[in-house]
Amino acid sequence: MVSFDVVAEAGEARRGQLQINDRTLETPHLFPVINFYGGGNEGALFGGGVHRTIKEFLAHDNEVTGGEDYSDLFDGVMTSISSLADYGIREKKLEWYLDNEIREWDCFSDYDGMIFADSGGYKILKQGGLEGEDFEKDIDQDKALDIQLDLGPDIVVNLDHPIHPDDEFEERIEKMEQTAVNAARFAERRDEVDGACYLTVHGYYEAMLERSFDLIEEELAEPVPEAFDGIALGSLVPRKDNVEVLVEAVSDCKREMQQRGYENLPLHVLGISGNAMPLLVAVGADTFDSASYLHQAINGKYCVNLFETVPIDDANFDACEC
């Protein structure tokens, strides 16, 4: 059972509740990106460097958390099938990881937040598939969904072909067409998903988004709101530092959704966080995901707020009320 209820509005901004089976997520919400499998074994929370530290907070490791409960920071998390091969694992270990859903491992059995399983389109398109120490796997829509479902997710999204600012017009259209074909195949397998199915669209401005939606609608056998539970706007990461472009993209996507009768679907913005989030919420975004917090931690930076970071040695932890 999937539903999205708007509980408050102010202009295009809205506060909502995303209900997926027995889990509820308050929006707006930022899904922190987590790599559940980082090359290690279960006793070490499957390793993964700084990812392991984050998982220690998620799994309530008292030695790390000092007995504090940080579960509200993990009401919903994002993971990607492409991250399974980030640490050069062997094929046997990949198969072992996928033998159990994430929550079926003892170390994650108490985790009750939502898991958003991304298709890994950007990395897969760039690398040509999943590559480990002794394997190379071509990934198409069916294989991507099979792996996503092995993770036991609450939200899945179709395998997409992100566009890039340097792409020629013909290349952008070709990628949009490939994404549309994948979306149609994804919709055909809708009944296999015990959760929410999100549709990926691409574009920085209205004409691009209009073409993206048109191509998808031409491929689908049913209206978008009958096949999908949410919209995910992609291809914005290369433009992440241009707030004006981000605002235009989200605003135009929201307008397209309204014109096509999709305004009741939640809108997720892939790979974007930071100081743009309040503005993007103001023009209609409901959820986000990002690994920026990890990159900042690796680089020794502490987020004072959405707009400012300081070196970790200069941080005043007493000023944080979280």
What are the residue ranges of the model-derived segments?
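Glycine-rich phosphate/ribose-binding loops and adjacent secondary-structure elements
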Residues: 23, 192-322
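Non-catalytic, usually N-terminal nucleic-acid engagement modules in DNA/RNA processing proteins
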Residues: 1-192
